[in-house]
Amino acid sequence: MPFKITITEDADRQLRFLPAREQRILEAAVQARLEHQPTTPTRAIKRLRPNPLAHYELRAGGLRALYNVEGDEVVIVIVGRKVGNKLVVEGEEFHGHQDDSVEPPGKRAREDAE
């Protein structure tokens, strides 16, 4: 039975931040690799060190999708581009392992503006 793929509102916005070509590459990788065995480690799927946002990473060239598996559903929570050893999300460096109060880039700025 295939897993249901969902994407959070923040991750969808992060995906739309990427150029159209990169969006298509990442969307194709998500469909090809996460529908049937999203937790099986491969060259493209990696289990992450413990952090509050995501348990797995999908790699598609220099693109990354961080996600969790909840029952029969794959929930994509972060989308970005790997630059060297950094993950860049919406043009900002993402720090996912610094503390337990980690939030995706852009979320703090939106909350401050409200």
Where do the language-model regions lie?
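Short helix-capping/hinge SLiMs at alpha-helix to coil transitions
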Residues: M1-P2, P38
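Enriched for short, Lys/Arg-rich terminal
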Residues: P2, E9, R24, A28, ...
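Acidic/histidine-enriched, beta-strand-rich ligand/metal-binding domains
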Residues: F3, Q14, R49-N51
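A short, surface-exposed loop/turn module that caps and links secondary-structure elements
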Residues: A32-R59
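Surface-exposed, Lys/Arg-rich phosphate-binding patches that contact polyanionic backbones
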Residues: R13-R24
